[in-house]
Every structure is written in structure tokens, then in C-alpha cells.
């Protein structure tokens, strides 16, 4: 990934200072500087549905901020065309991702986002439906699993449905126990087959799994993902990730310059999708971590408008 000095400097000051000599307040209206398509920085958030911490009210605060700042949600088809130079995006694009098909995505988040004119993207680990989801418990305040009919309604309403393996294994650990990739291939192929069986689609986009460190990734999983999907997305909850059996600094993994930030996360420049972002190194920012405070979410969006 290549980062120009101008882009790096503009991105790394969004939290508290000014960008290009202007106060962040100036970005709240359409009269501010309009970025060219190749200058866009796309904020991308991720969550696991409504929980005791990420309540419906807190989630609606984020939607209020996004609407106030006049952001438009996009899906992965639009993103892929833009990244490959085959399409354009709205002036202020925003991505709202959800991992795991919990019921609250369909019963609470979906109708709320519809009221705001927003759509999202759901990455489905199909083992969730069979109660073999890598031992992942429901988070506090979460309901059970969404139904296939509910997920189909999301899809027909403009949501992207992506792949997220079958049983949600730690992909980094699999690099040690399954070096040939046999289990990784089975995870992806089972996931794809079930999504095709129940939804009639072959997913084109993939979200790498995560754990308490952040993204779990392996060279084998990356290779297999590239054989099956168009894009691959990571997950940021702090400054580290788990790569090929080892803990690694996220910024080093994605070749982003600069030290970690005061909030405990990677350099600000690594938190957005740009035209320079490799297709299988897309970031996503967990709403329950670095962006949890509404002001942190606001500053994240403002940082895209430099």
C-alpha cells in the first residue's frame, strides 16, 4: 500500500486538529471542498448487531451524525467498481458493516437504517445457524439468529451479503494446524454453498474472522480468499492483529506509516479505504471499540472530508 505524504498528513490529524488549515466544523456542510474521486477516503464501520453496550439508542446517534454530515451509504458492488476504476461514488460515501447474522440486525438495525435511507452489508458465518459457530457466544443483549427469510429481505433491500467462513475459526491459528489449507477451503466452500442454497447467491466479498486481538489472518486463507472473492475485509479493534500464528502490529501488516495513535488504535491513515488500499486489506472500524463515543465517530467521519 502506498501513502502519499499529503494524504498521510491530512489523515492523521482528524481527531483533534485541523485539516488543510480548516476547522473540522467547516466539513459539516456541502460548501466545503469537494474531493476528486481519486482523493476519497471512505469511512467503514463494523459491529455485531445490537448489544447491551451498542444499544439501539447509541446506534441511532451514529446514524444521526452520518445524516447530519450528509454521508451516503454504499455497498460492496459500488466499492469494487470504484476501486478498480470502473465506477464512481457519491461525494461522501460511508460503509456500515455487520458481522454474524444475529436477529437484531434484521429486527432492529435494518428498520432503523431504512428510516435514514441507509443500507448496510452483512457478512454471514453460516455455522451460526447450526449452533457450531466456533464456540462464539452471543454478546450481552443479543438475540438469537436471524432467519434466512430476514436475510433475504436485507439482500432485496440493497444490502450486500458476504461470506465469513462456516464455523468462524481463528484463521491465524489454522496456519499452524492446517498448513495445506484443507480446512480453510472447507470453511469457505461450505459457507458459499449454504449461502447459495438459501439465498441464491454466490458471495463475492469476504470478511476475515476476528478474535479478542482483532483480525485473524493467514497467508493460506488470503490465497484461498483471492480464488473465491473480489474483496477481503479486515477488522480493527485496537493496534494489533493476528497473522500466521503471531501477534503483529496492524499498521505494519498493512504497510501504513506512522506510530499508533493516542486512542490505542493504528495510524489514522490506515482506518479508511482509499484508491491505494489493496483489495484484500480493506479496514473496518469496530463501533464498540475506538469509535464508541459519538464524538469519536463524528471525528472519524470528518477525517474523511479533508
Predicted regions and their residues:
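Short, glycine/acidic-enriched loop or turn micro-motifs at the edges of active sites
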Residues: 102-103, 167
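Short, well-structured secondary-structure segments
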Residues: 43-47, 54, 71-77, 95, ...
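Alpha-helix N-cap and loop-to-helix initiation/capping positions
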Residues: 138-142, 146, 178-183
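Acidic (Asp/Glu)-rich catalytic clusters
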Residues: 111-117, 144-162, 271-277
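Short, solvent-exposed loop/turn and secondary-structure capping segments
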Residues: 56, 106-110, 133
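A structural motif
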Residues: 150-174, 184, 195-198
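C-terminal active-site subregion of NodB/CE4 polysaccharide deacetylases
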Residues: 24-97, 104, 172-173, 178-185, ...
Amino acid at each position: 500500500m502506498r501513502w502519499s505524504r499529503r494524504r498521510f498528513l491530512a489523515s492523521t490529524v482528524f481527531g483533534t486538529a485541523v485539516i488543510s488549515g480548516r476547522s473540522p466544523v467547516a466539513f459539516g456542510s456541502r460548501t466545503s471542498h469537494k474531493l476528486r474521486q481519486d482523493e476519497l477516503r471512505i469511512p467503514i464501520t463494523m459491529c455485531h448487531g445490537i448489544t447491551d453496550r451498542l444499544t439501539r439508542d447509541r446506534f441511532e446517534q451514529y446514524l444521526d451524525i452520518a445524516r447530519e454530515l450528509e454521508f451516503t451509504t454504499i455497498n460492496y458492488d459500488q466499492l469494487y467498481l470504484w476501486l478498480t476504476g470502473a465506477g464512481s461514488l457519491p461525494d461522501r460515501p460511508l460503509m456500515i458493516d455487520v458481522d454474524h447474522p444475529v436477529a437484531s440486525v434484521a429486527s432492529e438495525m435494518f428498520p432503523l437504517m431504512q428510516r435514514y435511507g441507509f443500507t448496510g452489508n452483512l457478512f454471514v458465518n453460516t455455522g451460526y445457524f447450526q449452533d457450531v459457530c466456533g464456540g462464539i457466544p452471543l454478546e450481552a443483549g443479543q438475540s438469537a439468529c436471524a432467519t434466512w427469510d430476514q436475510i433475504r429481505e436485507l439482500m432485496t433491500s440493497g444490502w450486500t451479503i458476504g461470506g465469513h467462513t462456516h464455523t468462524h475459526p481463528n484463521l491465524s491459528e489454522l496456519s499452524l494446524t492446517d498448513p495445506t489449507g484443507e480446512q480453510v477451503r472447507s470453511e469457505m466452500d461450505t459457507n458459499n454453498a449454504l449461502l447459495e442454497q438459501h439465498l441464491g447467491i454466490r458471495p463475492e466479498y469476504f470478511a476475515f474472522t476476528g478474535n479478542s486481538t482483532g483480525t485473524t489472518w493467514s497467508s493460506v486463507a488470503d490465497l484461498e480468499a483471492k480464488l473465491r472473492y473480489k474483496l477481503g475485509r479486515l477488522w480493527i479493534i485496537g493496534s494489533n492483529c493476528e497473522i500466521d500464528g503471531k501477534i503483529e502490529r496492524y499498521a505494519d501488516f498493512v504497510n501504513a506509516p506512522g506510530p499508533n495513535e493516542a486512542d490505542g488504535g493504528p495510524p489514522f491513515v490506515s482506518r479508511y479505504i482509499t484508491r491505494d488500499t489493496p483489495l484484500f486489506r480493506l479496514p473496518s472500524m469496530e463501533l464498540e471499540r475506538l469509535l464508541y463515543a459519538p464524538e469519536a465517530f463524528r471525528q472519524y467521519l470528518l477525517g474523511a472530508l479533508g
